[in-house]
Amino acid sequence: MTAAQKRIWGWYFFDWASQPYNTLLLTFIFGPYVVSVIGDGSAAQAIWGYGIGTAGLIIAVLSPLLGAVADKSGGRMVFIWLFSALYVLGAWMLWYSAPSDFNVWFVMLFFCIGLIGMEFATTFTNAMLPDLCPRADLGRISGNGWAFGYLGGIVALIIMLLLLAEGTSGRTLLGIAPIFGLNPEAREGTRSVGPLVAIWYALFMIPFFLWVKEPRKTDALPIGQALRAAWPELKLTLARLPQQRSLFAYLASSMFYRDALNGMYVFGGIYAAGVLGWSVTNVGIFGIIAALTGAVFAWLGGKMDSQVGPKPVIILNVVVLTLVAIAVVFVSRDSVFGVPVGPDSILPDVGFYILGALIGAGGGSLQSSSRTMMVRQAEPERMTEAFGLYALAGKATSFIAPLSIGVVTDLTGSQQLGVTPLIVLFLIGLFLLLWVKPDGEPA
């Protein structure tokens, strides 16, 4: 491979390395495990929502400032190393969540430390995208990265289900006891998801750190000076955002639809475990289906993005995901879309698997095109700051989905009604796209 190709593949490997935090911890393995330990689906959904919402507020406050500092200092890699360490620490410590000594606040603390590490590392690697290829190839490269990341999540999930995660019988999907002598009665197979995610990230970030070289910035400032210079400029950037109508509208739109999508990811496994009574294995299969469709449609969406631009791709996927959010409310163990079913019926399971496939397809393509749309809206010399604002947009209201789900679930005592805020968030995001120019404001 040429140096340029290695750089692109190294960048892809960040998606491959980091995706298991979303796939295994946030959605399909560790989230449902917390539900099973707490024993009350509604209470677990509410606690999970409060924890994720708090982490989102921290990310929202710091992302733009750190992005501006990185642009001034030319030091994205330093931040990626730092937040990678938080990722690994947070994931590893989830091993200490045994059912016999389960401290929900300890678990949420380290889960959120890892989540913060992942989100900040993502901000800095996303900002490298425009340096990798010509503008015409942005959609394809972004889509390929998302697809490669989803494949990484699938492989990690398959390893988890086949070799480690014990089902209700105490055996894995292969019908064997968890490997390495892990004790299924203490849920050690399932708890090993934390160390697995930590080791996976550390191993597969090696190509990234070896092959992705940051261009030398001739006017780079020391970190201290960069911090002092970045804050006034960031305030100026925020003050003039309303005058940059297209960028402002896009940040606001993505703020809502990405929050809704993240709500689907975070609560999908918890919802299935609580409403349908699925085991960790069932939720894992659901995750494989969603990740497979996510990989395929991130790749297809990237091709479509390169041909017609990111805006039509974003609109299409937000519409699809809105319809899915509506459909989820009407799937339970007792009925499917209003039609009563017997207690042994497989229709609720089949229906939710189909919805999971649609969530994966829409989510993969939507996230890929959202990344390229941000590149089109941003000023090239302020790219990391722009992706910091993008992270701010994703997190400034990121507490709305989890906290509103937590509140509505608490008030109604129903996990089904608890997910209805996602519908409203998708529709707000769709409406705000009306003011977004496909290629951003003219220079």
Describe every region a protein language model picked out.
Residues 70-86, 306-321:
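Cytoplasmic membrane-interface "Motif A"-like loop-to-helix N-cap segments
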